[in-house]
């Protein structure tokens, strides 16, 4: 939205364009990593934790998680999401194309991959007990909120996040 506004106003949004390019490359990296670990994504259950663009909001406008879900659906993945506040807004976008879970445990159940997209405090507390409900324990942490050495999973931290 800001990029479009800047372009309309005759301003070259160089920094915003760079951020957008990084976001697109991060999405490609997530898809590539998931395919490398799971193979063809068709019929694979992939759980997205967090669809809001930041914690403590239900706002999904310009959320990179929404773009990721679109890419996963194009590859025929079975997508389940959990978000403490943004489920309704996500449902407005995807309707019945994806599954919605009110509990983290249900979202993780029988999942083959979990991708953490929003830094909700609930997600920072996740550990082996929660991940044991998965059929394949592949975790892609796009916010770097989990400490790898405490987890008995295939764990990949990418993108920006908290310093560990």
Predicted region positions:
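Structural/interface elements that position substrates and couple domains in central-metabolism enzymes
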Residues: 1-164
């Amino acid at each position: 939205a800001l990029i479009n506004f800047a372009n309309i106003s005759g301003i070259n949004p160089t920094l915003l364009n760079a951020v957008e390019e990084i976001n697109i490359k991060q999405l490609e990296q997530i898809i590539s990593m998931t395919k490398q670990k799971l193979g063809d994504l068709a019929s694979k259950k992939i759980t997205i934790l967090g669809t809001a663009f930041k914690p403590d909001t239900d706002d999904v406008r310009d959320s990179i998680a929404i773009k990721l879900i679109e890419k996963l659906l194009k590859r025929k993945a079975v997508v389940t999401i959990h978000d403490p506040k943004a489920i309704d807004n996500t449902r407005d976008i995807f309707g019945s194309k994806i599954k919605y879970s009110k509990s983290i445990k249900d979202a993780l159940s029988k999942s083959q991959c979990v991708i953490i997209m929003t830094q909700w405090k609930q997600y920072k507390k996740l550990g082996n007990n929660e991940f044991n409900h998965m059929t394949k324990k592949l975790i892609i942490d796009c916010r770097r909120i989990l400490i790898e050495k405490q987890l008995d999973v295939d764990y990949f931290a990418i993108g920006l996040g908290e310093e560990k």
